[in-house]
Every structure is written in C-alpha cells, then in structure tokens.
Amino acid sequence: MRVKNNVRKIREQRLMSKAELARLAGVSPVTIDRIERGEECRMETKRKIILALGFSLSDKDKVFQE
C-alpha cells in the first residue's frame, strides 16, 4: 500500500541528504528511502521524521497525509 507523504519534497527544500535526515531522526537511510517511495512505516518512525524535519506533531498533516 502506498502512503502519500511530502518527506522528499520537504527534505530537499531544507537541502538535507537522506543520510542527514536519517541521522537526525534516528533511523536508517534505507528507512528514509522506503518512506519517500511511499511505503508504510510505524507511527513512531513518522513521529521521529516529523520532528527531525523541524515540524511539531500538530503539523503532521504537512508531512504525512492519511
């Protein structure tokens, strides 16, 4: 199942590499790659990515669409 998200767009706007986002979020670069391709991930992983991109949890819809 594909999940719509703006992770790649936001990451590129912030001039971040996948490796840098992965390091800030505490996940692997492979995980970032899978998420950017639209693969499903755990809620905790989404939380880490939202915070690493500089958003608050209340702004989660700007990063991940349900």
List PLM regions with ranges.
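Short amphipathic helical patch at the helix-1/turn junction of helix-turn-helix
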Residues: 1, 12-13, 40
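Recognition helix of helix-turn-helix/homeodomain-like DNA-binding domains
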Residues: 27-41
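Key DNA-contact positions within bacterial/archaeal DNA-binding proteins
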Residues: 19, 29-33, 58
